[in-house]
Each structure stands twice: as structure tokens, then as C-alpha cells.
């Protein structure tokens, strides 16, 4: 007797649910906070933007190609397990190389402490004040480096420098510190950063002593000869690159003057990130495709659309867990390990846990090649229909603007003295608000038409960007994150709904994946490249305001163009396969709910006889 293989759908979905959950816990322990690590390395906004731009570009090109190769050679499980193992290893490598400077880690860590503790930073800072109330700060001389995270306070007046000849002076400040959003590069081996005295602010603390006056009389002429290219705002500080120094021991010969240390650090990080993304990018794409094919084989694809919920729950839990852990650690734990490295350790740990689940992950080896044909057909369909073209441009803009939030929002929060816990909570609030609104999705789709749902989503994102440019306190970001339900949820529900109406039978999912690929690949890559240079030229606030204006202009264009495009729905007969037998009734009430009858009515109403 030949035994028939049993398909345990419940077990398969349970394993897939745990896989999605733990993978997203690990992913959100690190990925949203990677930008803070790059900032502690001393990389300026343009360099960070380039790194993220290449990261998205690699994902854009490599993930679908690797998925195709895995499917062709029936090696999906091998690719999934290899991706988990190697990406965990390469990600954890950042905790050891390139090394962080302890002084800089201390100063960035210092902003997360209560304000009273911020007054006593863990390193010695030399301070001098001249007769014009220009205050100068200097880092210890034994490291020969600037403290790039030293802050210009809202009430501070004066100049920031690193001259070792300056004398120490007690400094009493009653306002919290703020961090920079720009890292200008100079050619000095020991950098100086000066800020103009803001007279008449009413908040300046006058610090004078006979010792500082004597010291500054000797330093005044040399300091006045060095002017900063940046004029400081009372609420924004600008700092030099924290890696602009004589020597940085990272195993590279720094005697070569063709590149300054900051750019050498940048090249090392860029190469590591590209390798990391090559290893990590195929994971989600291959896992999602494999699970969908498995459920398609057992006629249970309707249950595939709910698994993202567990991914969101895992992401929310991961972001809160890691930030709560990091905020409750000292700046340096055992063996002087900076607490920021725990992001990498937790990322690697959860991915290793997910690796064990991948051995049971449901995968169906199909010999059909129609999947690749559907993907090619979906990509070709992007340019064949005016409505899809307009939708593609919209999601491209959505990805470009969204990347600015992912890359630099935490910089803006850090500038107002936010701890990492508020950052983690902001992620969780955004995801959970979207998840909550999902249960009212069908009602929204009935109330609003496609164009108004897209306009609502774009408008919500524009309001968020404008709000980000005026953050005044660490907690202030939490309220606006509720709009993520509209800027990320509603707009994609509307787009997916339209794709179902427009796509040819069997290509709906492929077209939806193509649009997300366009948004989070092309759009995010372009937005990352551009946003870093905008921040360098202007500021973070200007970047978010520009994003808001761009979104409002696109809303107007979208509302004007979309109604003029042909609006004839295609009858998707493949949907009849999913119809329940109870829908085949001959009663008038059941006929009204019959999908084919409804589609025929819609088609007749769109004809002009």
C-alpha cells in the first residue's frame, strides 16, 4: 500500500508564525537603531545616507535574484538557514570592528541619563571662558581627539574646541544637552568647533574665574582666527567629525594622507554593510515565497495574509525590549563593552533562535516555473496601465520620504535629549496603531474610494514630517506616531485593493510584490542618497519640511490626474475559485453578494452605450 503524505497545516502555520515573530524581534533590536551606531562612529549625514542608499540598492537587486536561484535549484531551506547564520555573524562583527572611541560613547550615552547626571560626564572636559563670555570646551589630551558629541546647549554661548592648553573649570548648566545633526570636516588634526555667542537670550550662564581669564588671554588670538562655517541656532548644535584626528587604531595604515580617517571609517563600514545585506536580503523574500507556495499547494492561501500581524507584534516587542535593556545599562558594562553593542548581540541571538525554527519551516518544492513568468508579467504590467503607473510613482515617493524617517528621525530625537526607550516606544506605537486600524480595514474601503484613501495616507505622512521638524521634547514624537496607521497602513490597503481589480488573473500577488519592491527598494535608496546631502546643506528640520511640501504637491497632482485615467475594471474569474458554495444560491439576496454578478454589473455601468 502506498502511503499518502499528510499535510499538517496548523503545525506549518504555527512554525511560520514563530519564525516571523522571532525574526522580527531580532531585526528590530538592531535595524532601526543602526543609524545611532553610525553617528557614534562619527559619520556625517551624507555618509550615513550613502550607506543606507547602497543597503537598499543591494536589497533591490539581490533579493529577487537570489529567490529565483533558490527556487530553480530547490534550495530554499539551505538559503534561509545560511542567510540567518551568516547575517547574524556579520551583524555581530560590528560590535568589534571598527572600534568605538570611549570618550565619544560616553558623551552619547550621557544624553540618555537624567539631566542631573548629565552635568557630570564620565570624562574630563576642560572649559575656559573669556571676557566676552565665549566658552571653550576641550577633550583630554591623551586621546588627541575631539569629543564630537560635545553639545552646544540651548543656553550656551561660546566656542567649542579641543585645545589641550585650556584650563579646567567647573561648569554648572541647568539645561539638557543636545546633539548634532551635522559633522563638518576640517583638515586640522585636532579639531575645533566654535559657536557664536548668543547674547540677549536670557538663559546664558555667566561663568567667570581669574584662572580662565588668564588662560583665555593667551588663547584668544589663535581661537579667533578659526571661524566655524556653521552659524549655530540656540536650539541646534553642530559638531566636528569625531573621527577627524591624527591616529585611529583600526588596523589600517593612516600614514596615507589621500583619505582622512573619517572617510576610511566610512569605506570600511560601507563594505561591511554591503556584505551584510547580500547575506541578509534573500531571507524574507525566499521565506515568504516558500510559505505562499506551500499554502497554495494545500489550498490555504487565505491564511497567508494574516502572518504579518505576528511580524508586527515581534517588531514592537523587539524595539521595546532592546531599548528598555540598553537604557538600564551603564554606558560601559563588563570588560568596558559599550552598551550600544547589545543591539548587535540581541540581533545575533534572536537570529540564531530563528535558525532552529527554520529547520521546521514549511517549504513545498514545486516543479512549476509559472511563478517566475508571473513576476516578469507583473513587472511588464507596471508600465502598461496608466493607473498602475500613477500608483508606482506614488509608492516610489512613499518609499523615498519614508526612508528619511527611518534613517534620521532618531537623530532628531537625540537632538532634543531623547533616550532610546522613547525611540523604541515610537516604533511600537506606529506599528500597533496600524495593526489596530487593520481590523476596521473593510469599513474604510467601503467608505472611501481609492483616490481619497491614497490622499489620506499621503496627507498623514506629510503631517508627520512637518511635526518631526518641530520636535520639542523626547515624548512629543509618540502622539504623532498614531498617524502611521494611515500613512503606512491605509495607503497600502488601498493600493493592494486596486491591484486586485486591475491585475490579470494569477498575477495579483506578483504585482503587489513589485510595487513594494519599487517603494522599499528604488524609493528608499533614492531617498537615502538625497536626504543625507540635504541635511548636510541645510538641516534635519528643513529636510522634513521639504518632504511635507513634496507630499502635499503630489496629493494635488494625484487628485487631478487619477480621475482622468480610464476606470474600467477587469473581471477576474480566478476569484471564483475561492467562492464558497453558499454563495451559489439563486435568491436575490445571495445574487447581490455573488462576485460574478457584481463584477458584471460594474462592467455594464462603466460602458457608455
Curated annotation (Swiss-Prot):
Major localization class: membrane
Membrane-spanning parts: 41-61, 78-98, 265-285, 307-327, 340-360, 388-408, 420-440, 452-472, 475-495, 513-535, 541-561
Any matching Pfam family: MFS_1_like
InterPro entries named in the record: MFS_assoc_dom, MFS_MFSD6, MFS_trans_sf
Compartmental location: Membrane
Record-stated family: Belongs to the major facilitator superfamily. MFSD6 family.
Descriptive protein name: Major facilitator superfamily domain-containing protein 6-like protein A
Gene: mfsd6l-a
Amino acid at each position: 500500500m502506498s502511503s499518502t503524505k499528510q499535510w499538517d497545516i496548523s503545525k506549518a502555520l504555527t512554525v511560520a508564525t514563530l519564525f516571523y515573530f522571532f525574526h522580527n524581534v531580532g531585526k528590530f533590536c538592531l535595524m532601526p537603531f543602526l543609524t545611532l551606531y553610525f553617528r557614534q562612529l562619527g559619520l556625517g549625514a551624507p555618509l550615513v545616507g550613502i550607506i543606507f542608499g547602497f543597503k537598499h540598492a543591494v536589497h533591490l537587486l539581490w533579493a529577487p535574484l537570489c529567490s529565483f536561484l533558490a527556487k530553480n535549484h530547490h534550495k530554499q531551506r539551505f538559503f534561509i538557514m545560511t542567510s540567518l547564520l551568516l547575517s547574524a555573524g556579520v551583524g555581530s562583527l560590528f560590535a568589534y570592528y571598527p572600534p568605538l572611541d570611549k570618550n565619544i560613547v560616553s558623551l552619547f550615552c550621557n544624553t540618555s541619563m537624567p539631566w542631573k547626571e548629565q552635568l557630570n560626564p564620565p570624562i574630563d572636559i576642560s572649559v575656559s571662558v573669556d571676557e566676552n563670555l565665549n566658552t571653550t570646551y576641550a577633550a583630554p589630551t591623551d586621546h588627541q581627539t575631539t569629543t564630537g558629541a560635545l553639545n552646544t546647549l540651548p543656553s550656551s554661548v561660546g566656542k567649542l574646541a579641543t585645545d589641550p592648553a585650556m584650563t579646567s573649570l567647573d561648569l554648572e548648566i541647568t539645561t539638557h544637552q543636545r546633539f548634532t545633526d551635522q559633522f563638518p570636516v576640517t583638515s586640522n588634526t585636532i579639531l575645533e568647533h566654535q559657536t557664536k555667542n548668543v547674547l540677549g537670550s536670557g538663559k546664558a550662564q555667566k561663568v567667570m574665574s581669574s584662572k580662565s581669564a588668564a588662560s583665555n588671554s593667551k588663547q584668544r588670538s589663535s581661537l579667533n582666527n578659526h571661524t566655524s562655517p556653521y552659524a549655530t541656532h540656540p536650539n541646534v548644535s553642530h559638531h566636528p567629525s569625531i573621527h577627524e584626528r591624527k591616529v585611529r587604531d583600526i588596523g589600517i595604515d593612516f600614514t596615507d594622507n589621500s583619505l582622512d580617517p573619517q572617510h576610511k571609517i566610512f569605506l570600511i563600514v560601507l563594505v561591511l554593510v554591503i556584505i551584510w545585506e547580500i547575506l541578509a536580503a534573500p531571507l524574507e523574500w525566499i521565506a515568504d515565497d516558500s510559505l505562499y507556495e506551500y499554502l497554495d499547494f494545500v489550498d490555504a492561501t487565505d491564511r497567508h495574509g494574516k502572518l504579518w500581524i505576528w511580524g508586527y507584534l515581534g517588531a514592537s516587542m523587539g524595539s521595546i525590549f532592546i531599548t528598555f535593556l540598553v537604557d538600564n545599562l551603564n554606558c560601559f558594562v563588563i570588560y568596558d563593552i559599550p552598551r550600544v553593542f547589545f543591539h548587535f548581540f540581541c540581533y545575533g541571538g534572536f537570529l540564531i533562535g530563528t535558525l532552529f525554527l527554520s529547520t521546521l519551516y514549511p517549504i513545498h518544492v514545486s516543479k512549476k516555473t509559472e511563478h517566475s513568468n508571473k513576476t516578469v508579467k507583473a513587472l511588464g504590467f507596471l508600465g502598461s496601465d496608466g493607473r498602475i503607473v500613477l500608483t508606482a510613482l506614488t509608492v516610489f515617493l512613499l518609499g523615498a520620504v519614508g526612508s528619511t524617517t527611518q534613517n534620521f528621525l532618531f537623530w532628531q530625537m537625540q537632538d532634543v535629549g531623547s533616550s532610546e526607550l522613547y525611540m523604541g516606544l515610537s516604533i511600537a506605537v506606529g506599528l500597533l496603531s496600524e495593526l489596530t486600524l487593520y481590523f476596521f480595514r473593510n469599513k474604510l474601503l467601503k467608505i472611501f474610494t481609492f483616490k481619497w484613501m491614497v490622499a489620506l495616507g499621503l496627507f498623514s505622512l506629510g503631517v508627520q514630517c512637518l511635526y518631526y521638524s518641530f520636535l520639542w521634547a523626547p515624548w512629543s514624537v509618540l502622539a504623532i506616531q498614531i498617524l502611521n496607521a494611515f500613512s503606512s497602513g491605509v495607503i497600502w490597503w488601498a493600493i493592494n485593493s486596486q491591484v486586485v481589480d486591475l491585475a490579470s488573473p494569477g498575477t495579483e500577488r506578483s504585482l503587489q510584490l513589485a510595487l513594494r519592491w519599487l517603494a522599499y527598494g528604488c524609493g528608499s535608496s533614492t531617498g537615502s542618497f538625497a536626504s543625507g546631502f540635504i541635511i548636510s546643506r541645510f538641516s534635519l528640520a528643513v529636510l522634513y519640511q521639504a518632504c511635507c511640501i513634496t507630499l502635499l504637491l503630489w496629493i494635488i497632482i494625484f487628485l487631478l490626474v487619477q480621475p482622468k485615467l480610464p476606470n474600467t475594471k477587469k473581471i477576474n474569474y480566478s476569484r471564483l475559485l475561492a467562492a464558497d458554495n453558499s454563495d451559489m444560491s439563486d435568491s436575490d439576496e445571495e445574487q447581490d453578494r455573488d462576485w460574478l454578478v457584481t463584477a458584471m454589473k460594474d462592467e455594464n455601468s462603466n460602458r457608455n452605450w
